[in-house]
């Protein structure tokens, strides 16, 4: 099985982890978003040292490419691309909405609605097995009302979310479920489903500054 390096800087809490033989062998988190650029390489060195590995032992890099913090996404992906280029190893990008969905244990269809800005959300729907039903998109809260009528369970990080009463709140900065990420990363690695290093970009889903209002 491959040795995989994981980087997530899509939220204010940065996470770096290593997996071997399907298990997390080292993980570091850092809670200050303003320091991500300064500490990311230190975190990478720390997990490598804990696992008694060097970058030469890493077979591929997995990065949460968003949606999320614009600055964080650029920091994480640029670091991952730099390492992948220098070490000539594959790069795999993952969508944060999918990563959260894969970590759920639901028996019903559900939706992920992460707060983008006030009354704006990064949104996607999933089957009861966690399979994506519609592509992640940026929507205003009123655009979610038709989905609420489908009796979907909304999983959201916004305590003020009001499009549906059928909701479950998660911490906006919770650490992603590494077990489910590892399963999907190792499957992609075995199938050689890698991203193009030269053309890989963050999954922004929306412009950096949104002035549109539907009110």
Model-predicted segments: where are they?
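N-terminal beta-alpha supersecondary unit
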Residues: 1-63, 175
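A glycine- and small-aliphatic-rich helix-loop capping segment at beta-alpha/alpha-beta transitions
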Residues: 21, 77-85, 128-132
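Surface "functional belts" at beta-alpha junctions
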Residues: 23, 32, 90-177, 190, ...
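Generic hydrophobic alpha-helical segments
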Residues: 40, 44-47, 51, 101, ...
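Stable alpha-helical structural segments in soluble proteins, enriched in small hydrophobic residues
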Residues: 47-51, 86, 104, 178-189
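DPxDG-like acidic metal-binding loop motif
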Residues: 60-91
């Amino acid at each position: 099985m491959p040795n995989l390096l994981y980087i997530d800087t899509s939220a204010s809490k940065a996470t770096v982890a290593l997996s071997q033989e399907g298990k997390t062998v080292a993980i570091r988190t850092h809670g200050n978003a303003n320091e991500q650029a300064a500490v990311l390489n230190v975190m990478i060195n720390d997990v490598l040292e804990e696992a008694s590995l060097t970058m030469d032992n890493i077979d591929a890099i997995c990065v949460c490419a968003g949606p999320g913090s614009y600055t964080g996404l650029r920091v994480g992906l640029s670091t991952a691309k730099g390492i992948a280029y220098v070490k000539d190893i594959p790069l795999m990008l993952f969508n944060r909405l999918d990563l959260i969905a894969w970590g759920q244990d639901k028996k019903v269809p559900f939706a992920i609605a992460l707060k983008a800005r006030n009354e704006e959300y990064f949104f996607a729907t999933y089957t009861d097995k966690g399979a994506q039903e519609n592509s992640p998109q940026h929507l205003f809260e009123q655009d979610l009302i038709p989905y609420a009528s489908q009796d979907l369970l909304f999983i959201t990080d916004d305590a003020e979310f009001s499009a549906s009463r059928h909701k479950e709140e998660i911490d906006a900065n919770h650490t992603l479920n590494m077990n489910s990420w590892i399963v999907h990363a190792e499957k992609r690695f075995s199938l050689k489903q890698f991203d193009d290093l030269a053309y890989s970009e963050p999954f922004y889903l929306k412009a950096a500054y949104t002035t549109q209002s539907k009110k």
